[in-house]
Amino acid sequence: MGIFSIANQHIRFAVKLATAIVLALFVGFHFQLETPRWAVLTAAIVAAGPAFAAGGEPYSGAIRYRGFLRIIGTFIGCIAGLVIIIAMIRAPLLMILVCCIWAGFCTWISSLVRIENSYAWGLAGYTALIIVITIQPEPLLTPQFAVERCSEIVIGIVCAIMADLLFSPRSIKQEVDRELESLLVAQYQLMQLCIKHGDGEVVDKAWGDLVRRTTALQGMRSNLNMESSRWARANRRLKAINTLSLTLITQSCETYLIQNTRPELITDTFREFFDTPVETAQDVHKQLKRLRRVIAWTGERETPVTIYSWVAAATRYQLLKRGVISNTKINATEEEILQGELEVKVESAERHHAMVNFWRTTLSCILGTLFWLWTGWTSGSGVMVMIAVVTSLAMRLPNPRMVAIDFIYGTLAALPLGLLYFLVIIPNTQQSMLLLCISLAVLGFFLGIEVQKRRLGSMGALASTINIIVPDNPMTFHFSQFLDSALGQIVGCVLAFTVILLVRDKSRDRTGRVLLNQFVSAAVSAMTTNVARRKENHLPALYQQLFLLINKFPGDLPKFRLALTMIIAHQRLRDAPIPVNEDLSAFHRQMRRTADHVISARSDDKRRRYFGQLLEELEIYQEKLRIWQAPPQVTEPVHRLAGMLHKYQHALTDS
């Protein structure tokens, strides 16, 4: 496909984006909004953002959800802007400085919350700054400006949603159904690889792919939940399937690791059984039926615990999968599975990264303020706004540098494109509403196609072009104002990019170490006799951390294996029959406190000291288990955990 070619699958969304822009323009002019540009700009960003992220037409519900987040972010930003202005209107410089800190604070929060919800906080940060900068000439009009901005943005969002509904958005349900079938086959094939105990790299690749696919399925569940309330039952089942899929991965990998030391545990019966190849979910269904009969014949005690647990989880997966596909009423058996365990939310390991993002945003906004005051440029306020927008939106993404480059390319492309519209196309519409709508629809259509291709600069070009041509009724043509605005956008993006380059983010290694220590803490916390604590479901949170580790350190297999071993230890100890007595319970609490100290330690020396203390406590704990005559199901996983921590103590403590 050529660089300027148009694929059939891109046309519908391009028409949808053009419709959203035209609707927002028409409504803005009809109700004589003060700045209809904000409505048009909002409609374009809300519609195009999910398409750029998806690399194609977004699924149903994505645009609505993004619009909802934009409304929340705008209202938070407007309220914050009003509070800052009311409190500091007599000190304008201090007021702008506080706004810069507010933008940094919102970026800090957006770096810690779920990536789906971070958009609202990023928006709240620069909305307050926009309000404070815009009302500088007439501060008494602040409430009116805040209300107008909120109204225009809501109108733009409604127009984007109407355009989305008008062109029958894609449902993700069929993709979910197909992935559920395919994922079950992949889980069975992973178990086959682990029982064969072949090449470790092949197994690592297989379980790594399954972790990614399970995480992607969780993202599909979020999309399905946004799509319609009729999928509420499917959503509940998919949430449980996420845990079951992670359980299957854990049991398969533990089966592989067990054979490193005790290969005789996997009998020839099971080796021969898992030799049979499977291609479809129906093949897996038949094999599971046969496997359950084999287990019933051999007995639970003669079946390796990992295979027994794997079959139980796969059977539940199958049952819930059928319910998701049919979306029928939840029966009693399913309800028992769904009423399982409470999921635990883990503390973010990226606090240092979030603080770096805070300083990047705050310093870049302060730099923009100094640039504005030093130059006295009429478009200095535009520079500041662009800096805030770029840093607030870029910092919440994995590669902020590339996002800033995308904005630079977009603003550079917007200059000639905006010139064409401002000097040639729009003047020739001769104040005709129809011709103006057609001209902007053409812009939206072609940029909508480029956005779906994820062309570098396409998203920035769309927003920047609409921003500098300033659609108004009647249109006014002040070329110096246009040029100032266009150059202000470019300078703002360049300054933001400069700050991102200068304020280096060296938090990757620290984040990796914190993640690994959180895995250790989770494994230690599984050693408990507290019934409520044993019922807590840590598995989704642990695999979410593992997925972050994979993204932070692609190709670092030793780290992934260590993390996976800790997850396996956690699951095994969680189900282990630990003797119930006050002596062991008190020691469990002591070990959890020590593990927490390891995570929170700010220096290598303290971390090494607490980690050494944890290793000593594990030795004492093993002696206590012998005194209290704990069964091998307890002593063996504790011994393996202590051995792993001894082996990798330098990786877990040194910066």
From Swiss-Prot:
Membrane topology label: Multi-pass membrane protein
Intracellular or extracellular location(s): Cell inner membrane
Assigned keywords, A-Z: Cell inner membrane, Cell membrane, Membrane, Transmembrane, Transmembrane helix, Transport
GO biological process, one term: carboxylic acid transport
GO MF term set: transmembrane transporter activity
GO cellular component labels: plasma membrane
InterPro entries linked to this entry: PHBA_efflux_AaeB/fusaric-R, PHBA_efflux_pump_AaeB
Membrane-traversing stretches: 13-33, 38-58, 69-89, 93-113, 121-141, 152-172, 370-390, 407-427, 431-451, 482-502
Keyword Nucleus: no
Domain of life: Bacteria
Pfam families: FUSC
Cited PANTHER family: MULTIDRUG RESISTANCE PROTEIN MDTO, P-HYDROXYBENZOIC ACID EFFLUX PUMP SUBUNIT-RELATED
Family: Belongs to the aromatic acid exporter ArAE (TC 2.A.85) family.
Function summary: Forms an efflux pump with AaeA. Could function as a metabolic relief valve, allowing to eliminate certain compounds when they accumulate to high levels in the cell.
NCBIfam families: PRK10631.1
Annotated protein name in UniProt: p-hydroxybenzoic acid efflux pump subunit AaeB
